[in-house]
């Protein structure tokens, strides 16, 4: 099975596909509640708990992580935002590697 992740600090999407490409699960983690998710590590821990559940429930043998947003958008991104996204992508990528023990595949955003 394949686990696909679209990582963001506000909403991170995930999809689990079986070997025929059929969707097993498709959802997102909404982490916009600043009272619940005060720090970036609170968000990472929240995702980690579900990834541990996925590891126990599904025979995931491939992980695909969308490449993080890499360019400035007039009025839509700042250096601080870009750094935060890059840092969170790295944290979640490491958690995936640690839990699943496999190399990750990354791809360019559309």
Language-model segments: residues:
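Phosphate- and other anionic-substrate recognition elements at nucleic-acid/protein interfaces
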Residues: 1-110
């Amino acid at each position: 099975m394949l686990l696909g992740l679209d990582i963001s600090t506000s909403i991170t999407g995930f999809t689990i596909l079986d070997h025929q490409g059929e969707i097993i699960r498709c959802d997102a983690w909404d982490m916009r509640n600043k009272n619940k998710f005060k720090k970036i590590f609170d968000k990472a821990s929240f995702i980690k708990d579900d990834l541990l559940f996925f590891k126990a429930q599904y025979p995931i043998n491939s992980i695909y992580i969308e490449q993080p947003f890499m360019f400035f958008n007039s009025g839509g991104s700042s250096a601080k935002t870009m750094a935060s996204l890059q840092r969170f992508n790295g944290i979640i990528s490491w958690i995936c590697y640690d839990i699943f023990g496999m190399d990750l595949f990354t791809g360019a955003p559309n």
